[in-house]
Amino acid sequence: MKDDRVMSWPLFALAIAAFAIGTAEFIIMGLLPQVSADLGVSIPSAGYLVSGYALGVVVGGPLLAMLVGKMEEKRALLILMAIFTVGNIACMIAPGFNSLIVARVFTAFSHASFIGMAAVLASRIAPPGKEGRAMTLMFTGMTLANVLGVPVGSLVGQVYGWRTTFLGVVALGIISLLMVWYLVPAKASASKKNTQTNLQGMKRPIIWLGLMTSVMASASMFAFFTYIVPILQDVTHVEPKFASVALLVCGLGITVGGLLGGRLADWSLTRSLVLTLMALIAALVSFYWTSHFVYPAVINMAVWGCLSFCVGMLLQALIIRVAGESANYASTLNVGAFNLGNAIGAWVGGRVIDAGMPLNSITLVAATISLVTLVMVLGMFLSRDRSLLSYPSATA
């Protein structure tokens, strides 16, 4: 009897690895006050740890994709996870702020290639007709990083110091390395086309418009998310330990959004993106007022997290759907696009703070960026290439 279950041991291993990578990426948002105080830099300057990681993803993704692209996928994933683990060891022992930034950038080099390759691999090892749900389950590891990894890591950093948090991330990297080694089959994917054939599909304008849209969506998210703890402490006036609870609630919303995004993509990609972006803009604008009240602010954060990650999943599904045989490359570039937006958003948020504006005004800036994202999405759906959006999920 044929096994039609979406979850499998190889997919579970990929999800755990995604959890480790997501924790490493997002954990710094909950540690900015501790890192700032320990290394003697301002919070806006500490925000460069977010930007530096994101730029490392943008630069390292294409470079490592070329280096490991011809390898058997399991071997490539193991090499990428080893780079990730070594980088987090360097973060843990970094003697100063500059060396910590360098270590974060090095760690980030493996991020885009691993997640991009894992997203496509997840769809390939899934039963026919369930590729989209398999990809969503793999990305659930990233979203769970916000539910468990970021709040727990933030709390550990407050109690035992931020270096102890990075020790935990190193342990996650080692566990992920072992799980990929033992659980992912050596030949889990279909035979690859040659590089030239794969890159031919990247010439379609709709793919690049989709990548630019991912940049803007991510910039909106991280303009707010990077400084969410300082906002909670200085505007909402919560205790530092309660900030971890607020991050946990926000993480639950993010997890729901990640799962919801996969379902909505199967329902109607076009309608879902437009409606979700409209709701996201409303959530960001409302936070400008709810940020002054603890419980409304936390609820608003959870709604925002749900909508933000829902948009991210819809855009990832869009890129894989339209890329066809170029799915590996396009998926890797989309992870890079997301992190380029991460860097831009963190920088924009920092400039808002440096300009002396109220911290919660960052949400209005993020809402404006989301509005631009919505316009770009509408432009994509009106393009001559829009017929590609009706294709089923790729199993390239």
Regions found by a protein language model. Name each.
Residues 40, 72, 93-99, 110, ...:
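Helix-breaking motifs and short loop linkers at transmembrane-helix boundaries and internal kinks
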Residues 59-98:
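Conserved MFS/SLC helix-loop-helix module at the cytosolic interface between two early adjacent transmembrane helices
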Residues 61-73, 257-269, 353-354:
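Helix-to-loop junctions at the C-terminal end of transmembrane segments
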Residues 83, 87-90, 98-107, 295-303:
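Paired small-residue
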Residues 99, 127-184, 227, 231:
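Helix-loop-helix hairpin linking two adjacent transmembrane segments in secondary transporters
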Residues 103-141:
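Cytoplasmic helix-loop-helix junction between adjacent transmembrane helices
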Residues 271-315:
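C-terminal transmembrane helical hairpin of 12-TM major facilitator-type secondary transporters
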Residues 322-358, 366:
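A late C-terminal transmembrane helix in Major Facilitator Superfamily
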